[in-house]
Each structure stands twice: as structure tokens, then as C-alpha cells.
Amino acid sequence: MAEIPTSSNPSDDLETQKLNGNEEDYDHHHDEDPESDDENYEYALQIAEMLPFPMVMKTAIELDLLGIIATAGPDRQLSAAEIAAALPAAGNPDAPAMLDRMLYLLATYSVVTCTAVDGGASGGVVRKYGLAPVAKYFVSNKDGVSLGALISLNQGQAFLASWSKLKEAVLEGGIPFNKFHGMEVFHYQGTDPRFNEIFNKAMYDQSTYTIKKIVRRYKGFENIQRLVDVGGGLGHTLRVITSNYPSIKGINFDLPHVIQHAPTIPGVEHVGGDMFESIPNGDAIFMKCLLHDWSDEHCLKILKNCYKALPRKGKVIVVEMNMIEEPQTTPLAKAISQLDVGMMTQSPGGKERTRREFQTLAEAAGFAEFNPVCHVACFWVMEFLK
């Protein structure tokens, strides 16, 4: 842990600066607003000590701490001892104390609520913890999905180890993930079953959550007869779309080794192939969180193949986050920037793009019109019109 510097007599340092002729340093120090300087130091210390939060979140997901609190009922708060009692085979007598310290940290980030009550005969206080509004996204909903798997993926060993190669990648080039593991992330999935399971779960959960919101808000699926989902995985996205628009014939397009595990879905045909070679014909093409995996050069190949597969007036429906051109300090801006640097570290040329960059890609691929339609759960639904 970082040690906060102290001085038995702060004026000694200032007097020494004056005696040594460093009056400029002395005057600068003397003129500082002590309260503002304290706040800056506190923020710097938070940055220096930020690793425990994501790691505690990962452990909370693995232990299902938030799920245990949720099971107790709406607005209920539980003590760390009560939560520890619900853990399987919790034989560690220190578990309640450890959980209390972890949950305290989560409370400082507004992930959980906390109420301190009188400890009675034991003295001190007993803290009870409940779910803050954001916590619902880390507890499985009625569809069995949450963002918990995304935390397990990003804080898992395979991705964490890659960050150790970031400095080397900046100085020498290359992708940190490839440098550490000796292969691209999509190839690595085939060598690590546990990583592959977590990766697929994280993608499925996030996609399930967002596609339902997209279908409710975006009206551009109307009048589509044949919709091709490029990189559609096991077809879950098309399942949601076609269940809301039964007249649509869905074509789930992905690599052959992916679609061979795809389940039978009414109204959906699974087609194997390579999007860099060709894409099945349709009057509309859907791509969600696909372009951000690839470099501009790769994206142009994909989009040009989309253009060839569309009739006149056909469209590509692109769902991606939009990078903000100037950095902001909002939660959304931070989330997108974090994902962007994550893509830089883990993927083969992937990046988050600004709206202007998406428009440039659309025009370079030959599309006549670029139309940002609506914003849904951190994502923009954009149409590239032929």
C-alpha cells in the first residue's frame, strides 16, 4: 500500500527552501489552496490504488454476493456474516470480516448500499449491505443474463496477463494479447475451453440485453424480408428479431465451426462462410459489435462485401458504440474509452470509432447515405444505405 508522507514540522521544509535560495518553490507551495491540493492528492491516491475495485468486483461475481443479497428480497440489507453463511462450504472463520471489507469498498463505488447499526453487546457497529441501482446489471435477470460474465472475462487471467505486454507493444509494435499468448484472441479461444466459455457467455449476455432494447426502439426492421446477421454466432440475436418480426427470413452467417453448434431456430437459416470472402444476399444486413473487432482495412473488406450482397436501396444496420471526439468525464465516455483501449490490447486491430469515422468507412465502401438512427443502451444504431 502507498504510504502517505508526513512531516513533524512542515515549516522546516519551507524554511530550508528559503535558506537554499529556492524561493520560487517556496512561493509556489505557499500560494497553493490547501483544500484543493488535498483533493488532488486524494484523487491521485485513488488512481494509484485502483486495482482492488475491479478484482473485488470479480470475486463478488464469482461468489454471487450480489445474488445472495437479491435473493433476500427487495430493499433487504444483509450483514457480512449473513452473506457468509449463504456461501457454499465457507469454512473460513475470517470470511465475514473479509466480506465486510470487500462490500465496504463496493459501497464506496455505489455498487451496494450500506447502513451501519449498533453492534450491541459486541460493541462497535454492524454494517448491513443492500443492492444499489447499478447492481441489478450484475445479477442474473429473467433471461438469465447479466454483465457479471463480462467482468469475469476482462479480469480473467487471459486478458489480465496481456496488459503486461502493453509497454512493449507501444515501443515495438504488435498486439499485447498476441505477444503474451503467441496467437490472436479468436484462435486462443480454441485452446482454452474455460476462456472460450466465459468469452461466449459474456458476449451472449450483453447481446441478449441490448438486442431486446434495440428491437423495442429501432423501427428499421419493418418491411425487411431477408435479414443477414453477419457474425451472428449461434443465432440468438436473430431469434429475438424474428420473434418480434415473424415475416423476416433470418440468415445467421458466421464461420463454419461456429454455426455447427447453432440450435434450430424457427425462421432462421444458419450459413457458414468467411465474411472477408463473401456475404449472403439479403435486402438488409445486420452487424452488432463486429466492426470494432477489426482495423479500418478489414472493415472496408467486410463493408464492400455487404455492398455487393445488397439490392439497390438496401441497407446495413450497424450497432456500435460511438467514440466521443473530445474526452469527457461521464460514465459513458469512460466506458467507451476503456473498451477502446481494451480492443487495442486484446484484438487484431480493433477500435472504437467516432461517428465521423463510421461515416468515412461507409462512404469509402460505396454507400450513398449514412444515417445515425437512435441511441440504445450505450450503442448507436446506424444505417449505411446503398
Curated annotation (Swiss-Prot):
E.C. code: 2.1.1.-
S-adenosyl-L-methionine keyword on record: yes
Catalytic reactions on record: dopamine + S-adenosyl-L-methionine = 4-methoxytyramine + S-adenosyl-L-homocysteine + H(+); 3,4-dihydroxy-5-methoxyphenethylamine + S-adenosyl-L-methionine = 3-hydroxy-4,5-dimethoxyphenethylamine + S-adenosyl-L-homocysteine + H(+); 3-hydroxy-4,5-dimethoxyphenethylamine + S-adenosyl-L-methionine = mescaline + S-adenosyl-L-homocysteine + H(+); 4-hydroxy-3,5-dimethoxyphenethylamine + S-adenosyl-L-methionine = mescaline + S-adenosyl-L-homocysteine + H(+)
The protein's enzyme class: transferase
UniProt-annotated catalytic positions: 292 (proton acceptor)
Disulfide topology: none
Binding site for S-adenosyl-L-methionine: 254
Keywords carried by this UniProt record: Alkaloid metabolism, Methyltransferase, S-adenosyl-L-methionine, Transferase
Residues annotated as binding S-adenosyl-L-homocysteine: 207, 231, 254, 274, 288
Pathway assigned to this chain's UniProt record: Aromatic compound metabolism; Alkaloid biosynthesis
General function of this protein: O-methyltransferase participating in the biosynthesis of natural products derived from phenylethylamine, including mescaline, a natural hallucinogen potentially used in psychotherapeutic treatments. Catalyzes the O-methylation of mescaline para hydroxyl groups, using dopamine, 3,4-dihydroxy-5-methoxyphenethylamine, 3-hydroxy-4,5-dimethoxyphenethylamine and 4-hydroxy-3,5-dimethoxyphenethylamine as substrates.
Family according to the record: Belongs to the class I-like SAM-binding methyltransferase superfamily. Cation-independent O-methyltransferase family.
Subunit composition and interactions: Homodimer.
Protein name: O-methyltransferase 10
Source species: Lophophora williamsii (Peyote)
